Amino acid sequence: METIIEEYLKFIQIEKGLSENTIGAYRRDLKKYQLYMQEQKIAHIDFIDRQTIQECLGSLIDQGASAKSIARFISTIRSFHQFALREKYAAKDPTVLIETPKYEKKLPDVLDVEEVIQLLETPDLTKNNGYRDRTILELLYATGMRVTELIQIEIDDVNLIMGFVKVFGKGNKERIIPLGDTVIEYLDTYINNVRSQLLKKTVTNVLFLNLHGRPLTRQGIWKLIKQYGLRANINKTLTPHTLRHSFATHLLENGADLRAVQEMLGHSDISTTQLYTHVSKTQIRQMYNQFHPRA
């Protein structure tokens, strides 16, 4: 089964263009699956049946796996077995009758407009890394892009004259996101004045660099967002996705079209975008309860 797993991982990396993080998650799930089957002395993929899979899922639940984790695990092994059947590594797909559990999607943490401004104004613009950080925060809030998309942006992906940035999302899908006047100003100064001072002797087209002239990492962005959140005294859990959540929620609160927001966020399924309308409804309910005399 190990050989089939490796072939499957190669397939989804090449054919689907998934990120290393996503591939890593698939690999971990499949290694758990393989280990369980080894413990059950199952030597061949065709010996796996529905009951064995259900027992495997039961084992994960006993270990404390959440409904969301179980749903992802089922999705992974279902895709794996479909691949094995299609490529004739297996004669059947035992996941056909396995149901995916429903789980409640957690509403994301969102900053209000005042908190966003507090966060954006925290970096020290007199320092190169401070100006870079302000540009990063402005860009994340102005576009709603993922941090994994931001760290891949190259100089040529930014068109300041036309006012857009090109990013490559999940599955390496390209999309164009418009830029507002404020973020264009920050990008202009960063690209033409600040970046060259960070670049040093490094040769790279990547837009955002660290103090050593190397491309910033996802972990580096995570760290700076957490640090600025603490300095801004924001008492909410800040993650690299917080500004993305805030971008979507603020647009929808101000009447933006759901489909347009879906396009900018790069969501393949509009139900994911609709989650942000639930955030807005929650805030409306809180406001009603606070201010209506008969609430």
From Swiss-Prot:
One of its GO terms (molecular function) is DNA binding. InterPro entries: CB, DNA_brk_join_enz, Integrase-like_cat_sf, Integrase_catalytic, Integrase_recombinase_N, Integrase_SAM-like_N, Recomb_XerD, Tyrosine_recombinase_XerC/XerD. Pfam families: Phage_int_SAM_1, Phage_integrase. GO terms for cellular component: cytoplasm. Its main location: cytoplasm. The active site is at R146, K170, H241, R244, H267, Y276. Residues 106-289 form the Tyr recombinase domain. The keyword Cell cycle applies. Coiled coil: none annotated. Keywords: Cell cycle, Cell division, Chromosome partition, Cytoplasm, DNA integration, DNA recombination, DNA-binding. GO terms for biological process: cell division; chromosome segregation; DNA transposition. It is found in: Cytoplasm. Residues 1-85 form the Core-binding (CB) domain. Forms a cyclic heterotetrameric complex composed of two molecules of XerC and two molecules of XerD. Belongs to the 'phage' integrase family. XerD subfamily. HAMAP family: Recomb_XerC_XerD, Recomb_XerD. NCBIfam families: PRK00283.1, recomb_XerA_Arch, recomb_XerD. Site-specific tyrosine recombinase, which acts by catalyzing the cutting and rejoining of the recombining DNA molecules. The XerC-XerD complex is essential to convert dimers of the bacterial chromosome into monomers to permit their segregation at cell division. It also contributes to the segregational stability of plasmids. This is Tyrosine recombinase XerD.
